[in-house]
């Protein structure tokens, strides 16, 4: 049994984690170390305002003048990744830092997996981190479930879970 814990908009969450005054504001994130800085992540308020990933900050501001443009904070990203890994390691001894904002946990004992993963998601929420998780028999299915979860999604039958999904879903993860 595997669980994947996923932090959506990881870079944006890292940049905004200690700025609760920006909750509800339209915020976009750029990587200022790129040759041409474009918006790489944005929050729902910015999306509703018509801002899209791939736009330049100027284009985003043309869509919504009150858009707040932030730059990546790599030190905060490192701290957030360490926090995620810390909580993931409370679940089982076999944990992989799969990518930025993603940890995969392998369970040798399937008892109380759902309750324990829900506990970790709640602990992350208390630390001002929005996370979601997927639980399944394979790491790939748990990864996909985590991306589609509202909070925690347990997949007992991978075939029935995957069958209705459009192929575009796989391209988005």
Locations of regions flagged by a protein language model:
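Short, conserved secondary-structure transition motifs
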Residues: 135-149
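Residues that scaffold, gate, or flank divalent-cation-dependent active/transport sites
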Residues: 1-104, 109-111, 115-121, 125-126, ...
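Compact, charge-rich alpha-helical regulatory domains located at protein termini
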Residues: 146-173
């Amino acid at each position: 049994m595997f669980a994947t814990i996923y932090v959506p908009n990881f870079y944006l969450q890292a940049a905004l984690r200690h700025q609760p005054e920006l909750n509800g504001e339209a915020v976009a994130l750029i990587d200022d170390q790129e040759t041409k800085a474009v918006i790489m992540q944005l929050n729902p308020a910015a999306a509703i305002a018509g801002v899209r990933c791939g736009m330049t900050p100027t284009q985003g501001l043309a869509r919504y003048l009150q858009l707040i443009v932030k730059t990546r904070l790599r030190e905060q990203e490192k701290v957030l990744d360490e926090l995620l890994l810390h909580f993931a390691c409370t679940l089982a001894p076999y944990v992989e830092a799969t990518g930025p904002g993603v940890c995969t946990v392998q369970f040798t004992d399937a008892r109380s997996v759902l309750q324990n993963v829900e506990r970790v998601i709640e602990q992350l929420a208390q630390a001002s981190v929005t996370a979601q998780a997927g639980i399944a028999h394979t790491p790939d299915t748990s990864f996909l479930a985590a991306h589609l979860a509202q909070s925690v999604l347990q997949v007992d039958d991978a075939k029935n879970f995957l069958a209705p999904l459009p192929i575009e879903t796989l391209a988005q993860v």
